[in-house]
Each structure stands twice: as structure tokens, then as C-alpha cells.
Amino acid sequence: MRLANPLTLPPLTLAYLGDALYEAFVRERLLERGYVRVNDLHRHALRYVQATAQAAILHHLMPALTEQEQDVVRRGRNAKGHGAPKSADPAEYAASTGFEALVGYLYLAGQAERLSEVLQAAADFIERGQ
């Protein structure tokens, strides 16, 4: 999809979309690796999608992000109104929101190749054991 200027959207809207896109990417990746039982899919997906994992991914990716991508991450990380669940560390949850905002932004900006690079790097990072 391509939106004229996804930067005009609220960062939490970008993160909302990015969350769904990343979750779908992870599920597809797990299916490709032979996981077909729902319980196995769910258990393995948690390694990729928990706030702790996404915060670690973001920390790993930040040096490789462009200035504009880092700005999107900052907007997502600093957005108000995304209170962390009681079980999550607020800083990690904010960082994971920044990662999700980046994913949503890249998708809406029509940057499919860059989105694929970011998602692949994220999954590879988790699979290497962080």
C-alpha cells in the first residue's frame, strides 16, 4: 500500500498497523518453518512479538536506520496514550511501540523492499538468540 504521506498519521496509528503486519510476518515465517499446531505457533510467536523482544530488536536495528526512520521510531516511542500493561516494562513497551510504528510507516510509505529488510533482520536477530 502507498499513502501520500504516512508521516501525517498519529504514531500510534502507525504502530497499530505495524503490530498487525509484524504479527502476520512472524506467523507466516513460523508456518514456513513447519510449525502447524496452533499451540506451537503461539508459543514460538511470543519469542518474536513480546515487548521485550521488540525492544531488543529496535536497539539492534537503530544504527542501521535512516534519520527519517529513526524519527518515526522516536515519535512512536514517545507517543502518549500507549500505557504499558502491568506485566511489561514501560521503557520496553515504548520501544516496541516505536518498532511497530516503523513497520507501519514503511508499509504505508510503499517501501516494501526496506520493510522486508527490517522484518528479516528482526527475525534473524531473534532466531540467533538475541
Swiss-Prot record:
An individual GO BP term: rRNA processing
Span list, region Disordered? 69-91
A single GO CC term for this protein reads: cytoplasm
Active-site residues, Swiss-Prot/TrEMBL = D19
Q: Which UniProt keywords are listed?
A: Cytoplasm, Endonuclease, Hydrolase, Magnesium, Nuclease, Ribosome biogenesis, RNA-binding, rRNA processing, rRNA-binding
Please give the PANTHER family that the UniProt record associates with this protein: MINI-RIBONUCLEASE 3 (PTHR34276:SF1)
Please give the name of this protein: Mini-ribonuclease 3
Question: What is the protein's species of origin?
Answer: Symbiobacterium thermophilum (strain DSM 24528 / JCM 14929 / IAM 14863 / T)
Classification of source organism: Bacteria, Bacillati, Bacillota, Clostridia, Eubacteriales
